Amino acid sequence: MGVMKEFKEFAVKGNVVDMAVGIVIGAAFGKIVTAFVDGVLMPPIGLMLGGVNFNELALILQEATGEAEAVMINYGIFVQTLVDFIIIAFAIFLVVRGINSLKRKEEAPKTPPGPSKEELLLGEIRDLLKQRS
């Protein structure tokens, strides 16, 4: 029974739950970005480049012969995935940058308070004693 209790404590901790929520939201965000890149961003870019469909861009290493399929390097899909990655990485960068700036504001050191009345009086007494000796 001890193992189950430990697992329950581990699974219910804030960090694990936060991480799980982050993973689910991240996966959904990735799908949104992929749909945006595939359906909205790449078609106009392909049109500007002379009607190129990035999904069909490939380097044929060996033509199809008989029953054997062609051997190709599909670099167009790679280009689209690279654009996906850049957009997601930039969005994550902006989020992390915002969080870091909030942390810096919270951690900003407060100016230390000036000396108390007792410290000032002790300093004056010290100075007077130095003058007498």
From Swiss-Prot:
- Provide GO CC annotations from the record: plasma membrane
Where is the protein found, in the record's own terms?
Cell inner membrane
Q: How is the protein disposed in the membrane?
A: Multi-pass membrane protein
Where it mainly occurs, coarsely classed, is membrane
Q: Where are the transmembrane segments?
A: 10-30, 76-96
Annotated NCBIfam families = mscL, PRK00567.1-4
Q: What does this protein do?
A: Channel that opens in response to stretch forces in the membrane lipid bilayer. May participate in the regulation of osmotic pressure changes within the cell.
Protein name per Swiss-Prot or TrEMBL: Large-conductance mechanosensitive channel
Q: What is the lineage of its organism?
A: Bacteria, Pseudomonadati, Chlorobiota, Chlorobiia, Chlorobiales
Gene that produces this protein: mscL
